[in-house]
């Protein structure tokens, strides 16, 4: 049996731009992608903390060190510049590997810099 588990999460990032006239996707600072192990073209779930919207798209790497989180295409209708979002990637893990699976979580500051990098989400944590 296989299970779908959270593989990586970018928590409390601020939307820097919403570009309706782009083909689609989310552009994310490549340094942040590297830190959590997300890759270009990876399918991700976006959760908008401001309005409760949840949707899926794929990643485009952005300029390193820029702090960019730009929602492109139709997804731009679901966010506004300044909204707080969570970006989540998932992995399909065989049952026998679940105990060894360790997701990475980047907690972002107000400038989209990694404030804390956590391996495996702690239980009962309020962030």
UniProtKB/Swiss-Prot annotation:
Substrate binds at residues 57, 73-75. Its cofactor is pyruvate. GO terms for molecular function: aspartate 1-decarboxylase activity. InterPro entries: Asp_de-COase-like_dom_sf, Asp_decarbox. Is synthesized initially as an inactive proenzyme, which is activated by self-cleavage at a specific serine bond to produce a beta-subunit with a hydroxyl group at its C-terminus and an alpha-subunit with a pyruvoyl group at its N-terminus. It catalyses: L-aspartate + H(+) = beta-alanine + CO2. The modification Pyruvic acid (Ser) is found at residue 25. The keyword Cytoplasm applies. NCBIfam families: panD (TIGR00223). Belongs to the PanD family. Heterooctamer of four alpha and four beta subunits. This is Aspartate 1-decarboxylase. It comes from Geobacillus sp. (strain WCH70).
